Each structure stands twice: as structure tokens, then as C-alpha cells.
Amino acid sequence: MPLSPAGVLSSTSTASNRSRNRPRYRTKALSSEVDESLFGGIKPLNQSDSPIVLLRDKHAIRKTLTALGLDHKPETIQLITRDMVRELIIPTKDPSGESLIMSPEEFERIRWASHVPTREELEAKEQACKKEKEAIVDAVTTRKKIMKQKEMVSRNNQKLSDLEEVAKERAQNLLQRASQLRMEQEEELKDMKKIILNAKCHAIRDAQILEKQLIQKELDAEEKRLDQMMEVERQKSIQRQEELDKKRREERIRGRRHIVEQMEKNQEERSLLAEQREQEKEQMLEYMEQLQEEDLRDLERRHQQKLKMQAEIKRINDENQKQKAELLAQEKLADQMVMEFTKKKMAREAEFEAEQERIRREKEKEISRLRALQEKVQDYQAEQDALRAKRNQEVADREWRRKEKENAQKKMETEAQLRKSRLEQVAFKEHSLAVQVQRDRDEFERILRAQREQIEKEQQEEEKKAMERLQHANELRRQVRENQQKQVQDRIAIFEEGQRLKEEAQKRRERIEGIKKKKIEELRATGLPEKYCIEAERKANIPTNTSVN
């Protein structure tokens, strides 16, 4: 289906946004190659093949549509269903005529070339290459033997023909190539390849780091400029705030002056009102003194009752101390309950005092109300209020005595319940202690039996292991004697093999060192900076004086 103009425009804007967001690409590898077949091949298309059509980039399609005057909204059909309305684009032919058509074989070749092999595939490919190289080496070795045999047969000091010279040169080149491929598979040369690749990567990375540092400097300069702009704006804001604070201080000063004037005026009014109230206070002072004397007598009486109650509590506490000597653990719980009872009683007394305080405040309120009405019926109302207050006080006293009596009765019942609970707790703890002692005795006997059985079992296993160790020691002595005889024979063979391997290793090291030096020279020839070449020589353990030109 061809792309619609709207789709081309949206894809173009999306591509441009992505190009702005991506970092700028810089070419690092100058020897990169591009598969030119992606841009259209010269090979004629076989009409019998099934073509695969690949659209080119959207920018080219958009330009083509604009040039041909076909950049318009495509024809659509509106499809109305039960739950939605859709517009379907009617497919048309490709108006540009620039679609790339390639054969299935070419498409499969490109797809296979773009495939990223896995680690297993790479290992399998490496094994296949290794086997192929070994086969080539074997073939070359066989051909070399044949050539030597032919040379020995035909050695008659006569000059070789041109064809024989070419064959000989070709065989030598093939043999040299096979030897080089075999050396490339050595671990040292593989490590050398990694070192060279690492040096190239370091050079690229340093160039990228330098570029990032330049970008960071530009960003820092821009950030510094923005900070300076923000600092100027902040100074202006501080100046505006100081002016606003100055105006507010002036307004507060004017407000204080107005308040002082108002306070002076109110002070004069309060002075006049205070003189009037002073006269009223003198009239009510005698009445208040009488009420205070009654309150003092009432407080003294309550104080005496409190002392009696405290004496009773002290007596109870003394009894508890005696019982505590006998049952220390149970007495702790009892003391806690007594203290809780005391706290509750003190709370009740506080409530009573609060009630008395409330009554006193009500009296003061009543006095204030009487003061407002004293001009009319001051004497008569005062006597009635005093009698009413006295009756209220008597009722409150009777109620308090009734509550105290009930509290004393509850206290006695609580103490009886506590004594009963203590006795039950003592009996329960004695029973629990006896049960626990019996359980401990049974557990001790069970553990003792298990330990005896374990000791017997361990003794049997120890005897069995001692017998096995004896047999194993005899077997080891026999094997040691056999191994000593075998080692004498192996040392002789190893010494001979070692001499041969030492000579081969020396030759191999010389060949590898030569290849390493050659690769370092090739690396210098690519134009890589000298410091990376020196680092590669150091990692490859190549002497510097032998590698520097």
C-alpha cells in the first residue's frame, strides 16, 4: 500500500525530531564499506521470480509526490460499526515509480549478511575454519612430501622448466600461507589481536572524551551566563522586596500610633469604671470574707478526713509489707493493685475538689450577678443567696459523705478479693512448679538415654572407620610402590619429551615475536598515535628498543 501524504509528513517530522535528539555522528572508520546492491542492482530481473518490493525513504517519496502534484489526501471510505467509526484508505498504485525491486535470492543474501551470529554460531564457525585450515595444512604437507619424492627421483642437476618453476613457487606460497594461518591460531597472536584492537578502541575513546569535554565547556559557559542573569534578577527581586518591607514598616508605625492613642483613651474610661467598681468591691468585701471563712472551715474538715484516709492506707500498706516478706512475687501484684486503688481515690478526691472549685466559681458568678442587682434589692437578695449557698453546701457535704462510705465499702470488698486471689495464685504456682519439676525429670532421663545410645553408636562407627583406615593404608602403600616404579619410567620419557618440547617452544616463541613486531609496525603504518603503539608493545611484552624505528 503506498504511503499517504499525511503519513509522509508525520514520519518526516518524527525523523527530524529524532535527528535533532541524536548526538552528531562523527566518522571514525575510513575503510567502511556499503553494500551497493541496496540502492538498486544492475542485474536484470528475471520475470519468473517472485519480486519483493522495498519502499525507499520517506523524504524521497514526499519529494516525488510534490513534484508530480500528487501530494493530496488519499481517497478513503468511512466504515461505521456498532462501537466505532473508522476511515479506511483505498489502496492505489505507487505514484513515484521509484520502488526498489529485488529478487528473492538477493533479498536472502542481504538478510543473511545482516544476521548477527550468536556465540555458539561463532564458535561453530571458528571450529569449521580451524578444521578447514588443518585440512589445507595436511594437503600442503602431503603435496610437499610428493614434491620432495619427485625432486629426489628427478634430481639430475638439470634446469627446471618454466612450468615447474611456477608450480614450485606456488607450492612454497601455499605452504607459507598455511603456516601463517596456523600461527594466527596461537593464543599469543590472538591476544596480540586483542591488544591492537584495544589500542584502536582507546584512541577512538580518547577522541570522543575530548569532544565531550569541549561540549561540556560550552554547556558550562552557557550555564554560567544563565546564572549571572538569574543573579541580576535576584538582586532586582531583593530590591523590590526591600521597598515593599519599608512600606509595610511605615504602615505598622502608623498603626502603632493609632493603637497607642486608642489605648490612652480606653485607659481613661477604665479609670472611671475602676472607681465605680472599687466602691462596689468595698460593699461586697464583707460578704466575700464571710464566704471565705466558711470555705476555710470546709477545707480544714476535708483535710482532716484526708489525713484519716491516708492513715488507713498506711495501715493497709504496713500489712502488705508483712505479707510481702512471705510471698514476694505475689505481693508485687498486690502493691500494684493497691497503688492503682490509691490513684483512683486520689482521682476521685481531685474530682471532688474540682466540683468544689466549680461550686466556688458558680458562687462568684452568682455574686457578680447580685452585684448588678444590688441597687434594687441588695440586702434581701444577699441573705437569700447566702442561705441558698449554705443549703447547697450541706447537700454537697451529705452527698460526699455518702460517696465516701460507698468507697470505703468497695475498698474492703476489694481487699478481701485481693487476699483470696493471692491464695489462689500461691496454690496455682505450687502446682505448676511440681508439674514442671516432673517434666524436667522426664526430659533429663530421655536425654540421658539418647546420649548413651549415641555414644555406643559412635564407638561402633569409630571401630568400623579404624578398620577401613587400616585397609586403605595398606592399599595406599601398594599404590605408592607401583607409582614410584612408574614415575622412574615416566621421568625418563618426560625428560626426553621436555627437551624436544623446549626446542619447539623456543622456535615457536621466535616466530611469534617476529609476527608481533610485524603487527606493531603495521599498526604504526595506519597512522595511530605513538603512545597507543607503545602501550600495545608494553602489553604484548615486546622490547621497545627493538620495535621503534
UniProtKB/Swiss-Prot annotation:
Residue stretches in coiled coil: 119-232, 259-393, 434-522
Organs and tissues of expression: Expressed in respiratory cells (at protein level).
Region described as Disordered: spans on this chain: 1-29, 388-416
Cell compartment(s), UniProt: Cytoplasm, Cytoskeleton, Cilium axoneme; Cytoplasm, Cytoskeleton, Flagellum axoneme; Cell projection, Cilium; Cell projection, Cilium, Flagellum
GO biological process, one term: flagellated sperm motility
GO cellular component, as recorded: 9+2 motile cilium; axonemal B tubule inner sheath; axonemal microtubule; axoneme; cilium; sperm flagellum
Keywords noted in UniProt: Cell projection, Cilium, Coiled coil, Cytoplasm, Cytoskeleton, Flagellum
Keyword Nucleus: no
The keyword Coiled coil appears for this protein: yes
Entry-linked PANTHER family: CILIA- AND FLAGELLA-ASSOCIATED PROTEIN 45, NASOPHARYNGEAL EPITHELIUM SPECIFIC PROTEIN 1
Assembly with partners or alone: Microtubule inner protein component of sperm flagellar doublet microtubules. Interacts with AK8; dimerization with AK8 may create a cavity at the interface of the dimer that can accommodate AMP. Interacts with CFAP52. Interacts with ENKUR. Directly interacts with DNALI1. Interacts with DNAH11. Interacts with DNAI1.
Function as written in the Swiss-Prot or TrEMBL entry: Microtubule inner protein (MIP) part of the dynein-decorated doublet microtubules (DMTs) in cilia axoneme, which is required for motile cilia beating. It is an AMP-binding protein that may facilitate dynein ATPase-dependent ciliary and flagellar beating via adenine nucleotide homeostasis. May function as a donor of AMP to AK8 and hence promote ADP production.
Family: Belongs to the CFAP45 family.
Descriptive protein name: Cilia- and flagella-associated protein 45
